[in-house]
Amino acid sequence: MSKKMQTQEEHHEELVKGLYEQMKTVLEGSEQPIFIYLDDNHKACNSKFAALLGFKSPEEWASIEGFLEPYVAEKSRDTLMKAYWDAMKKMVASTSQITFMKKGGGIVNSTVVLVPVPFQGHLFSVHFVTNAVS
């Protein structure tokens, strides 16, 4: 009997769950809002980040397709994209001033520390949010 081939979508979902489990102590114990990003549709966050942006749960936050358009104010998109690509290509962490958009309106100004994190052959970006002010 052959084993069912896993789709790329299933594989990426499994990776996000795996990294979340590996980082669970930090994600659930930290006072900071934190999110993990593989790509626009494969991401996770802790309850503090979900609440910061007005979501009832991390699952509700992660279910929204995309990333920059629904969550990041237009003025911060280039900054966050540059920080992300520097992390992915140069393996460098960074600190940036980012304005997030809240569900249902409003904004949150914050400082984001973005760190590249390898997991099972894939490179994620892990974002620690500080100094968040609505």
Residue ranges of each PLM-predicted region?
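Short loop/turn elements at sensory-signaling interfaces that couple input to output
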Residues: 3, 112-133
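Short, charged amphipathic alpha-helical "coupling" segments at sensory-output junctions
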Residues: 7-22, 134
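Sensory modules in modular signal-transduction proteins
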Residues: 17-39, 47
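PAS/PAS-like sensory domains across diverse signaling proteins
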Residues: 40-43, 51
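PAS/PAS-like sensory domain cap-loop motif
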Residues: 49-62
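PAS-family sensory/regulatory domains
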Residues: 61-75
